[in-house]
Amino acid sequence: AQDRSNVILYPTSYGAQHHDTEWLIGKGRVLDPTEWFIIIPNMFGNGLSSSPSNLEAPYGPERWPVFTHWDNVHAQRRLLAEVFGIEHLALIYGWSMGAQQALHWGAIFPDQVARICAVCGSARTSIHNRVFLEGVRATLTGDPAWTGTHFTAHPTRGLRAMGRVYAGWAMSQAFYREKLYETVGFTSLEDFLVRSWEANFLRRDAHDLLASLETWLASDISVYALLLGVRERALGAITARSIIMPSRTDL
């Protein structure tokens, strides 16, 4: 719209880049580009925005800064204002880490967000979620190429194992019990694990995956000075009309 009143921000999730999330966009789909101006910012650490795999010295695969959602949200705000001249968002839609970014937006810049739809996200990474993430990290860094600070080669063994561990958390018990993977083109459980989960992680840079994992672990909308470190204050700062959508079968 000429008045820029129809802007939707759609941040990326863990291990995803903008082209992985475009399936929601299309005429008659959840995000309809004939009605909305949709922007997908690539999260720091995802391999397209600043990430261990593309940082210049003194940073890089052997050393990188911790990216936080504070960084993501402030960079996105500058992108919107300085590139597109956008000061107000009709909606922020996000899944998983994208939902975390949506909630951060709502707490940090409440006057600039009209609506939030946060799917399978959280205002703060829970202890149970941290257990999952630490298990995934231990699996990946168990590869022989891990030195304690970085990988000396593409950690094929660790990435394959990471995919298999992640698959047990990402999909529900009912999904496996009912063999729903067979309804989306896979011939067996092994075929699903190899062609979906192993393949997805094998095409990623392992250092980028670790950097994004650190962002996930650090996610907490209440830690910033303006919110005084109080979760209730942070949540109370959100004035946007919000849909917080958990999954009934989520682990």
Where are these regions (language model features)?
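Active-site nucleophile elbow and catalytic-triad environment of alpha/beta-hydrolase enzymes
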Residues: 195, 211-234
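Conserved alpha/beta-hydrolase "nucleophile elbow" surrounding the catalytic nucleophile
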Residues: 12, 94-95, 247
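Short beta-strand/loop motif that positions the catalytic acidic residue
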Residues: 238, 244-246
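Alpha/beta-hydrolase-fold enzymes
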Residues: 112-113, 118-199
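Short beta-strand immediately N-terminal to the catalytic nucleophile in serine-hydrolase-like folds
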Residues: 92-94, 119
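Conserved acidic catalytic loop of the alpha/beta-hydrolase fold
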Residues: 59-63, 70-91, 100-103, 108
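N-terminal cap/lid subdomain of alpha/beta-hydrolase-fold enzymes
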Residues: 1-57
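Acidic catalytic loop of the alpha/beta-hydrolase fold
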Residues: 216, 248-251
